[in-house]
Curated annotation (Swiss-Prot):
GO biological process: cellular response to fibroblast growth factor stimulus; negative regulation of apoptotic process; positive regulation of ERK1 and ERK2 cascade; positive regulation of fibroblast growth factor receptor signaling pathway
Protein's recorded name: Dual serine/threonine and tyrosine protein kinase
Gene designation: DSTYK
Organism from which the protein derives: Apis mellifera (Honeybee)
Cross-referenced Pfam families: Pkinase (PF00069)
PROSITE patterns: PROTEIN_KINASE_ATP, PROTEIN_KINASE_DOM, PROTEIN_KINASE_ST
CDD domains: PKc_Dusty
Coiled-coil regions listed in the entry: 7-37
Any GO CC annotation of this UniProt entry: basolateral plasma membrane
C-alpha cells in the first residue's frame, strides 16, 4: 500500500495547480471589477479577498507538503522511515542527529545545506565510499550548530516511492518544533511521530506540548516502532487489578476476535506500554477517548476535521498511507473552501448590487417625475392665490390699517410708534435732521409693522400648501441628491435648495418678516405721489409723530397695496418656478447619463462578471466534492436531453440512497456561464421537500484532456422514480394528479420566495417519488428576476407571450403552470391540437410564435374539463401578465377541486357532483381568481394578505441580449 504514496502526491499536485489557476482567475476578475469602478469608494479586492484570506490560500498553494518524522529517539524514527520507504537507508541506532531530508534523484547523492538554500562545503563520509546506509558521522549534529538556523542533510535517492514530489524530513530530537514554526522549510507538514520502546519521557512530552500549541489544527499519527504492542497473555508488570481486568477482556473477546478488523486497535490486547502511551497522549489532547460503561472499553472521539490517530505497528503501512492521504485532502479542502467563500461572497454582492441597480433604474425617473409634478401643483396653487385672493388681501390690509390706527390712538407713548428715537416727552427736542428725513423714518416704521402683520396672515393662507407639498418635495429631492456629484453640480443643487427655501418655505421672523420688505421700494412710490400737507414745525415730539403716523395710515390705499403685494409675490413665484425647472433639468440630465452607465454596469455584471465568478465557484466547490468523495460511478443511462445525459448511481456524497448524475459538456463560454449560474442558483436554494436536492458537482478534466473547455461537468442530485411525463403516460388517478398540481405550485412558490424564476416548468422537469409526490428539477433556466437579460428561453408550448418581447417577470411560471395543468386535467401527454399537426421542431416553433403573438390561441378545451378547471387554466395563461392570478390565490382553488374529487371515484362523477352542488355553493373558488386582489396588476385594499406587484423593467432594445434557447418537449 505504501507504494501508492507517489500517486497521492501526484494527485495533490494536480489539484493544487488547478486551485492556483482558480486563484489567479479570481484575482484578475476582482481587479477588473475594481478597475471598472462598479462599486465607488470601495476596494473590492480587499473587501472580498481580504489579506488574511489571501495569506491562508497562498500558504497552502505556495508551499509543498512534506512528511515530518518526529519521535522519541533516533532509533524509533529510523525504524519508521526504513519501513515507510522499504529501504534500510538510516542506521537503527540512537544519537544526536541533524535535520535530514529525503527526496527523489536520478542517482543517490548527499549534501549539506543551510536552510535548504546554501550548500555547505564539508567532507561527508558518504561521498568518500559507496553506501547503502547513511554513515552515522554524516547524520550526527555538530556541537557548534545553531538550532535556530539548522543545517539539513539533503539525501537524494533513486527510489520510486519518492517520485512526484514526495519529501520526507527526519527531525532532530531537540528544537524541531521551533524550526518548523519559523517556516524556514516552507512546507505543509504531515506529522508522523515514532514511538520507541519506553513510555514518553518528560522531554518528549514537552516537545509534544509545543507541537500541539504551534499546530493546534494539524493531526499527528503516532506509530509504534515495535512490530506488535499486543499481548497473548497477561503482562506480569501490571498490578493485580489490571491483570484481572485484562484477563476478563481476553476471555470475553476471544470469541469475537476473528470478526475484528485487522486495521483497528485492539485495546483489550494492548500491553502495558501501549496503554501507557495512550494514557499519555490522551492527557496531552492528541487522542480523545472515553470509556464506555456498557462494554467497558475505549472508543475514539472524532471531530469534523481529520484527527490524530494511533497505529500499533509500523508494519501497518496502509493506515499510514490513509493518514497521509487524509492530510493532503485536508489541505486541498481548506484552500478550496477559502476560495469558494470568496466566490460566494462575490456573487452575493453582485446579485444584491444588481437588485439595487434595478431599483435605481426604476425609481429615479419616477422620483424626478414626482418632483416635477408636485412642484407644478404647488406653483399652480400659489398662483391661484395671486389671482383669486386680491379682494381677500385688500380686506385684510384694511383691517390691519384700522388696527394700527387704534393702537396709535390708544398708545400713551411712542414706544410702539418709533423705538429707534430716544426722546423725552416733557421737552421739545429740535431734530438735526430735516422734516423730510423724519417723515421717511416714520414711514419705514409704519410700513414695517404693516408688512409684518400682512405677511403673517399671508403665511397662514398658504400654510396648508407648505405642509402638503414642501416636506414630500424636499425628501424626494434629498434622495435624488444623495448620489449627486458635488464637484460638478454643486451650484445647481444649492440653488435648488435656496429657491425652495426662499420661495416656498415662508418662514417669518421679527427681524425679516417674509420677503415683503422688498416691497418697500414700490410702496414708497405711493407716498411720493401723495401730497401730505403737514406743518413745517421743527418740534418732533410724540404728538407730532402720532399725527404723522395717522396721516400716513390714512393715505395708504389697501387696493394698491394688495396689487403690489400680489404682483411681487407672483413675480417671485414665477422666478422660483423657472429656477426650479432649470435645476430639475440639470438633475435629470445628470441622472440620464448616470442611469445609462448604471444599466451598462448591471448588464456587465449579469452577462460577464457574475457568470465568470460563478464558473470559478463551480470549480472550487467541485474540487471540494471530488477530494472529499471522489468521482461517482456512472451506471446505466436513464435519460437524455438537449444539453446532457443523465446516468444512474447507487450512492455518492456520504449519503445513502440512489442518485442521478447529469453529465454536461459545455460547448462554449456562454454554455459554461449558463451552467455555472444554474449550479450556483441550485446550490443556493435551501432544502425544500418540493425541490430536488443537488448533492454536489464534479468537473472531469480528463474528459477533454485539458482545463476548462472540453471538460465534463457532473451534477449529482437525488434520484426519483420517474418524471411526470412518464407518470401521466403510465396512468395516474385524478386525485394523484391534483396532488401533483399542488406540489408543483408549492415548489414554484418557494422558488419565487427566494427571488428565483424557473422559466422552464414542464412535464419532464417535474419528478415523482414512489408515492407520486412531485418535486421540481432542472434549473438550467432558473435565475433571479433581477438578473434576467430578456432571453427567450424555455419549451415552446409552455412559453408565455411576453417571452418573445424579452420583457417578462415571474408570471411566466404561472403561464407554464397553466399549460402543465392542462396536461394534468387531460390525463395524457399528447400535444394540444393547435400544435399537434406540426411534425418537426421548426414548424412547431413557428406555430408557437404565431400562437403567442395572436391573443387567445391556447390549448383547446377537452370534453372532460369541467368549468372550474378550465377557468383556472384560462386565468393562468392570460395574455396580460397582470391578469394572471397570484400563486397563493390558486392554492384554495386546487384544494377545493381536490376536496370534491375525494368524494367521487372518477372525473365524470366530479362533474355530476358540481351540477348538484352549484345551487348550494355560495361562491365558486375559481371565480375568486378574477377578483382584483388575486391578480398581479391591480392594487386594492380588501384582502388582509396581498402581494406587492412585481414591476416590469423596460430596457432599450439595443441594451438587451435577445437570443433564443429552445428545449425539446
Amino acid at each position: 500500500m505504501v507504494s501508492k504514496l507517489p500517486q497521492e502526491f501526484r494527485r495533490y499536485l494536480r489539484n493544487r495547480n488547478q486551485l492556483q489557476h482558480v486563484l489567479e482567475e479570481t484575482q484578475q476578475a476582482l481587479e477588473l471589477i475594481n478597475l471598472e469602478n462598479f462599486f465607488p469608494e470601495e476596494n473590492v479586492v480587499e473587501e472580498l479577498l481580504s489579506p488574511l484570506t489571501l495569506n491562508r490560500i497562498t500558504h497552502i498553494l505556495a508551499n509543498s507538503p512534506a512528511i515530518i518524522i518526529l519521535g522519541q529517539d533516533s532509533k524509533a524514527k529510523a525504524i519508521v522511515v526504513n519501513t515507510l520507504i522499504s529501504n534500510d537507508i538510516l542506521p537503527v541506532c540512537n544519537g544526536l542527529w541533524r535535520w535530514i531530508r529525503l527526496t527523489y534523484g536520478q542517482t543517490n547523492h548527499i549534501s549539506l545545506t543551510l536552510d535548504l538554500e546554501y550548500e555547505l562545503v564539508e567532507n561527508l563520509q558518504a561521498n568518500e565510499k559507496p553506501w547503502s546506509t547513511l554513515p552515522i558521522e554524516d547524520l550526527t549534529k555538530s556541537d557548534n550548530e545553531d538550532i535556530t538556523y539548522p543545517t539539513v542533510l539533503e539525501v537524494q535517492l533513486n527510489l520510486p516511492i519518492l517520485k512526484d514530489g514526495v519529501q520526507i524530513f527526519i527531525a532532530p530530537n531537540n528544537g524541531a518544533v521551533k524550526v518548523l514554526a519559523n517556516e524556514f522549510l516552507s512546507i505543509l507538514p504531515i506529522f508522523l511521530y515514532a514511538l520507541g520502546e519506553q513510555p514518553l519521557t518528560e522531554q518528549n512530552l514537552e516537545e509534544l506540548r509545543d507541537l500541539k500549541e504551534t499546530y493546534p489544527f494539524n493531526p499527528v499519527l503516532f506509530i509504534s516502532s515495535l512490530e506488535n504492542i499486543s499481548l497473548n497473555g497477561i503482562d506480569p508488570e501490571l498490578t493485580e487489578s489490571e491483570q484481572h481486568r485484562l484477563q476478563n477482556r481476553l476471555y470475553t473477546n476471544d470469541s469475537t476476535s476473528s470478526k475484528t478488523d485487522d486495521d483497528s486497535i485492539d485495546f483489550d490486547r494492548m500491553n502495558s506500554l501501549g496503554l501507557s502511551w495512550l494514557d499519555q497522549l490522551t492527557n496531552l489532547g492528541f487522542l480523545g477517548m472515553k470509556e464506555s460503561v456498557e462494554v467497558d472499553q475505549l472508543s475514539w472521539l472524532g471531530s469534523g476535521q481529520y484527527i490524530s490517530d494511533f497505529v500499533g505497528s509500523c508494519r501497518k503501512t496502509d493506515q499510514i498511507l490513509y493518514f497521509i492521504r487524509g492530510c493532503l485532502q485536508t489541505y486541498l479542502i481548506n484552500a478550496s473552501t477559502y476560495l469558494n467563500e470568496v466566490h460566494t461572497a462575490s456573487l452575493r454582492k453582485f446579485i444584491l448590487s444588481a437588485f439595487d441597480m434595478a431599483r435605481i433604474i426604476q425609481i429615479t425617473p419616477k422620483r424626478i417625475q414626482y418632483a416635477q409634478h408636485k412642484e407644478n401643483e404647488l406653483y399652480a396653487n400659489l398662483m391661484k392665490i395671486v389671482h383669486e385672493k386680491q379682494q381677500e388681501i385688500t380686506g385684510l390690509i384694511q383691517n390691519i390699517i384700522q388696527e394700527m390706527k387704534n393702537d396709535v390712538l390708544l398708545s400713551n407713548n411712542d414706544v410702539y410708534l418709533y423705538q429707534n428715537t430716544m426722546s423725552n416727552n416733557n421737552q421739545r427736542t429740535e431734530w438735526s435732521a430735516t422734516v423730510k428725513a423724519a417723515i421717511s423714518e416714520v414711514q419705514r416704521v409704519v410700513l414695517g409693522r404693516l408688512c409684518e402683520k400682512v405677511a403673517k396672515q399671508l403665511v397662514n393662507s398658504v400654510n396648508c400648501l407648505r405642509e402638503s407639498f414642501i416636506g414630500t418635495l424636499q425628501r424626494c429631492l434629498l434622495s435624488l441628491e444623495k448620489t449627486y456629484e458635488r464637484d460638478t453640480c454643486l451650484l445647481a443643487s444649492d440653488a435648488l435648495k435656496q429657491i425652495l427655501s426662499a420661495a416656498y418655505n415662508v418662514e417669518l421672523h421679527n427681524s425679516s418678516p417674509f420677503s415683503i420688505y422688498s416691497f418697500l421700494e414700490r410702496l414708497n412710490l405711493i407716498f411720493m405721489s401723495s401730497s401730505l400737507q403737514w406743518s413745517s414745525t421743527h418740534t418732533l415730539d410724540v404728538a407730532w409723530r402720532r399725527k404723522v403716523t395717522i396721516e400716513i395710515l390714512n393715505s395708504l390705499s389697501a387696493t394698491k397695496l394688495s396689487k403690489i403685494i400680489l404682483m411681487q409675490f407672483g413675480d417671485k413665484l414665477e422666478s422660483s418656478h423657472d429656477s426650479f425647472q432649470a435645476a430639475l433639468r440639470s438633475i435629470e440630465n445628470y441622472y440620464s447619463g448616470k442611469l445609462e452607465r448604471t444599466e451598462e454596469q448591471r448588464i456587465a455584471l449579469r452577462k460577464y462578471h457574475a457568470p465568470r465568478l460563478a464558473k470559478l465557484a463551480l470549480e472550487s466547490t467541485s474540487m471540494i466534492d471530488v477530494v472529499r468523495y471522489g468521482k461517482p460511478h456512472c451506471a446505466e443511462e436513464i435519460g437524455r436531453g438537449q444539453y446532457g445525459i443523465v446516468f444512474a448511481c447507487d450512492g455518492w456524497g456520504g449519503k445513502a440512497g440512489p442518485c442521478a448524475i447529469k453529465s454536461v459538456v459545455p460547448s462554449d463560454e456562454s454554455h459554461w456561464n449558463d451552467l455555472a449560474m444554474e449550479f450556483y442558483y441550485n446550490r443556493s436554494i435551501p432544502d425544500h421537500k418540493r425541490i430536488v436536492k443537488l448533492r454536489g458537482s464534479i468537473i472531469d478534466h480528463s474528459y477533454g484532456g485539458g482545463f476548462g473547455f472540453g471538460s465534463a461537468v457532473l451534477l449529482i442530485s437525488d434520484r426519483l422514480s420517474r418524471d411526470l411525463y412518464c407518470g401521466i403516460r403510465a396512468g395516474l388517478s385524478w386525485l394523484e394528479r391534483i396532488q401533483i398540481a399542488l406540489d408543483v405550485l408549492e415548489g414554484i412558490r418557494y422558488l419565487h420566495s427566494q427571488g428565483l424564476v424557473h422559466r422552464d416548468v414542464k412535464l419532464k422537469n417535474v419528478l415523482l417519488d414512489i408515492e407520486n409526490r412531485a418535486k421540481l428539477t432542472d434549473f438550467g433556466f432558473c435565475i433571479t428576476e433581477v438578473m434576467m437579460l430578456g432571453s427567450i428561453v424555455g419549451t415552446p408550448v409552455h412559453m408565455a407571450p411576453e417571452l418573445l418581447s424579452g420583457h417578462y417577470d415571474s408570471s411566466v411560471d404561472v403561464y407554464a403552470f397553466g399549460i402543465l395543468f392542462w396536461y394534468l386535467c387531460a390525463g395524457h401527454v399528447r400535444l394540444p391540437y393547435t400544435f399537434e399537426q406540426f411534425h418537426n421542431k421548426e414548424l412547431l416553433w413557428t406555430s408557437v410564435k404565431k400562437a403567442l403573438m395572436i391573443v387567445g390561441i391556447r390549448p383547446e378545451r377537452l370534453p372532460s374539463f369541467d368549468d372550474e378547471c378550465w377557468r383556472l387554466m384560462e386565468q393562468c395563461w392570460s395574455g396580460e401578465p397582470s391578469k394572471r392570478p397570484l400563486l397563493g390565490a390558486i392554492v384554495p382553488v386546487l384544494e377545493s377541486i381536490q376536496q370534491k374529487a375525494k368524494r367521487s371515484k372518477s372525473l365524470q362523477e366530479v362533474s355530476s357532483d358540481k351540477l348538484q352542488e352549484s345551487s348550494t355553493d355560495s361562491r365558486n373558488p375559481a371565480l375568486a381568481l378574477a377578483e382584483p386582489y388575486n391578480q398581479r396588476g391591480t392594487v386594492v385594499s380588501p384582502p388582509p394578505t396581498k402581494r406587492r406587484t412585481m414591476k416590469v423593467v423596460k430596457y432599450h432594445l439595443f441594451l438587451t441580449n435577445l437570443y433564443i434557447q429552445m428545449r425539446e418537449l
